[in-house]
Regions:
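Long, contiguous binding/interaction regions
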Residues: 1-206
Length: 206
């Protein structure tokens, strides 16, 4: 299973129909494929299939796809064009602004944010503002005005994140999660030390 990257996204478009299209795609869990579709020819596996005849066909199809699309299979296409290997949405976290020209949503993506797709959405007239946080690899960032600013959080304390990156911290509760994790570790250490002391005392009475 991948590390999950948390995403918060605001989309704007002058055409309410495009916002509704994005909303519907998110509800289906097909947001990225709606606007940056994977060619059907790329829906093949990567690597080995075992059977020699099938393997030869797979290798021929992969080579042809590389020549036509620049990618051998769906996985490489998604990582290259979307920025993440699976589609996003289907989490019931999307809302359209009453005027119909703005959408706010949150979702998880595999390993990384779909910043590659954001650039292509902008080419379709969307204005994109997004924040993301991946706790497993300790990075976060902001995508705005076509620029992706990734921030390395490794080694930063809860206080440092709270003061230096307040918007990201407010969005994802990063400092709170760090403090909760540290408190849990302290409780486990205290319990371990107490248990060890009790066992030592029992041995001395024998």
């Amino acid at each position: 299973m991948p590390n999950w990257c948390n995403n918060n996204l605001v989309l704007e478009h002058d055409d309410p129909a495009m916002i509704k299209r994005a909303y519907d795609a998110l509800e289906r869990g097909e947001f990225l494929n709606e606007f940056v579709p994977v060619p059907k020819d790329l829906m093949i596996v990567a690597g080995s299939v075992g059977d020699p005849v099938e393997q030869a066909k797979l290798e021929a199809d992969t080579q042809r796809n590389l020549e036509v699309y620049g990618y051998g299979n769906w996985y490489d296409y998604c990582v290259g064009e979307w920025g993440t290997k699976w589609d996003v949405g289907d989490q019931g976290c999307s809302d359209i602004h009453p005027e119909g020209r703005m959408l706010h949503t949150s979702f998880d993506s595999a390993w990384a944010p779909p910043t590659g797709a954001y650039a292509k959405l902008e080419a379709l007239g969307f204005r994109v503002e997004a924040m993301y946080y991946e706790s497993g690899m300790c990075f976060a960032g902001v995508y705005k005005d076509g620029c992706d600013e990734e921030i390395n959080l490794e080694g930063m304390s809860a206080d440092e994140i709270e003061s230096e990156h307040p918007d990201l911290d407010e969005c994802f509760g990063i400092s709170e999660s760090i403090r909760e994790y540290q408190a849990m570790e302290e409780e486990e250490l205290t319990a371990w030390v107490k248990d060890g002391a009790e066992k030592t005392a029992e041995l001395k009475t024998l």
